[in-house]
Amino acid sequence: MSFLQKIFGSSNQRALKKMQVHVDQINLLEAEYQSMDDAELFALRDKLAKNYADDLSNLIPHAFAATREASVRTTGLRHFDSQMLGGIALADGNIAEMKTGEGKTLVATLPAYLNAVQGNKVVLVTVNDYLAQRDAEWMRPVYEFLGLSVGVIHSNQNFEEKKHSYECDVIYATNGELGFDYLRDNMALRAEDKVQCSLDFAIVDEVDSILIDEARTPLIISGPTNESAEYYVQIKKIIPKLKQQLREGTEEEPLLEDEIGHYMIDEKNRSVELTDEGYIEVEKYLEDLGLLQSEDSLYSVSNIKIMRYVNATLKAAYLFKKNVHYLVRGQEVLLVDEHTGRTMSGRRMSEGIHQAIECKEDVPIQKESQTLASTTYQNFFRLFSQLSGMTGTADTEAAEFAEIYGLNVSIIPTNQPMARIDNEDLVFLTREAKFKALIAEIELLKEKEAPILVGTASVESSEVVSELLKKKNIAHQVLNAKQHEKEAEIIANAGRPGVVTIATNMAGRGTDIVLGGMKSDDALEWGERHQKVLDAGGLHILGTERHESRRIDNQLRGRSGRQGDPGYSKFFLSLEDDLLRLFITDSRRALFERIGMGDDHIEHKMLSRGIENAQKRIESRNFDIRKSLLEYDDVANDQRQAIYSLRSQLLEEDNISEAISDLISEEMHVISEDFVPLESVESQWRLAELDRHLTEHYLIEVNIQNQVNQDKKLTPELIADLISNTAASRYKEKYISIEQNIEQLEKQVMLQILDVHWKDHLAEMDHLRQSVGLRAYAQKNPKNEYKREAFEMFETMLNAINTEAIKILFRLEIASEEEIQELEQRSLEAQKNKEMRLQQAKPDLEVGNENAQNTSLEPITRDQPKLGRNDPCHCGSGKKFKQCHGNA
């Protein structure tokens, strides 16, 4: 602690001191609210809103005191002072770090009621449907006692149910469903088809999971493309014939003949690349398969597409492991979330990797897809007028919360002193020695009848531990992505005496492990179990490896020691664990190996520092990745907001005919200037071409050549006005018979064209994003280039929307109002019946929704001179092809 901190206290201590003033005021008001009858508390909302509309400082104590009293009367739970501190932190738009078991669900009722009094919609965000429904039902009596309505948003609701839920005062919802509803609303063809409420105030539960772990996760609504899956099937045949190369050759130490291979794996950066020999070998196999013509080159521009299939198949084969990165359930490949250990239904990897894994596992290959609408959690949650959050582990990410979201972290003291004992890590030379020591520890603790939670980082590790326990005849239960349906039951029993539970990181975010197990009807029996566990030292956490993030390790520890209960945690590590193997230097590894003795563990401060520094480096790298994603997505987000704002205006306006008239005038002036430039002379005018263009594209006959022949005083400006006026008259005449309903037609045309162009624009932005990094070779800043080109593309898209809309409106043949209604109905049905899958993707991921059909493949032929791997790249970067577009 610094000298100044000793005098003034830390920033967190100073913030808590200010909040304590409010807590004291709330406690003074407690007797006053205890004296109120139920009817008075029910009607209090309007009274508080009237008396303290512009006085938040005085509103907080009254709103919080009322909520505390309502909770006591309905649930029997009284908010502790520490929970009041958490509520004040949330009300101020901060993140409240509150340890496991401190009652975050109850805390959320305080700022929720406060904001409802202020007239704000309150959204409480959870990580899954179960928690949203559980928390809503648990807290519903409190809210309804205070006159508030409560809604729950989940994935299985129909339109009417969801619409009703969003109309409530307090809404519980998952982060994914909120994001998808936002995207769906901005694809609606009628204003009444929107469901989502205004985004006023959000309380994000497990905020670190949603805003940090999921920050790189784009929310994508997508539809299928026509890419063939047969390429994966054919290229899969090549992979077993390739040999791995274990090191790069150097001048000092060139590769021996038997060391030369076809591909190299970089585990640290999770990449796999073909070597020069590998490219030659793959070309030969592709020719044998008929996918590449003889004498053609895999490096030519026309063959970039097939390289994508090769790269995806290599990654699927060597970087993604079954039961670690994904599971196969039935006929489907399900990704496993590295942070929680849960399967991620509906999520698919992009760049063809998911299809390649499906091919590898011999399950039906689903089609790739095209993005129809997308956003990121980072940008979606920044749409809320005020954002706050709760978690047990936020302090290690405080800098990121502040920089990205403008959220400060308030560390709330526990209601009872922490009694958990956190032991030093035990580090072994080998995984075998580590697991041997782990099993011995479990046997020892089981004799004491202590409940044991063994935390693993993957399904594979959990199954290894399970097999070892079976050999020792130690009864246990397993909670991983394969058994996630039993999660509630397993967690409920995890605190019983002598129970051994093996769990991946999914172990109970949002669910407490109660010492002695869940309380039963037999209070005496539960009391005996509870005391037995207390005597054994509480819940014992045994970690089998360190996670990349210190925060995830802290979450595992946080399962124990709730509300002042005793607890114990210890990590068993080995130098063969991924974190230590990839991020501990060779020199340090050699030192630790000299220190270690057989199956004994290593204890050394240098090792502890090395592990922590490795975690910090990874956390810093991941932060940089998330920050970079945001910088790019901010560009897309500005465009997204502009398009969605335009869509909202189109939906909400009763009549857009005036805007259409302006567009017609603007479009006609642009066309006129293309053929009759301003400041030009008559000899430069292309009048015949102008007449032909107007007739062919807009069915407008102006006969401008005759007009000019008859009136020599016509200037380019007057010609443009003449064309504009003629077009306006023609448009009015065209729709005179359906004048009352013309706005319906105009809206439908504008919306559909806007959506089509926006979809294509998203694809172009994806392509730009993937290729813009190459600009660095030309000494240009990729981010600046991305911003510049994205802006130009956006302007081009807006102009194209206007042009196409006017063309269609002039060419569309509508004879009656019934035809307009039929057109609108067809559009709505197409929207409902469109085969789309919703996706919470991994970074830049896509999704398909149909099984790909086997099709015969034509060999890819080149239409450019053969390009060698060491030739200059076609993009003009000046780099060799293998270092540029040929880089796997």
What is the meaning of each model-derived region?
Residues Y326-L334, T340-R347, Q563-G564, F571, ...:
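Extended, charged helical/alpha-beta scaffold domains that provide interaction surfaces
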Residues L59, S302, M349, T393, ...:
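Generic detector of ordered secondary-structure context
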Residues M1-G596, S645, D662, E666:
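Conserved P-loop NTPase motor core
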Residues K50-L59, Q157-N158, Q293-S297, D521-E525, ...:
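Alpha-helix capping and helix-coil boundary motifs
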Residues L867-C873, S877-A888:
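A short, cysteine/histidine-rich metal-binding "knuckle" motif
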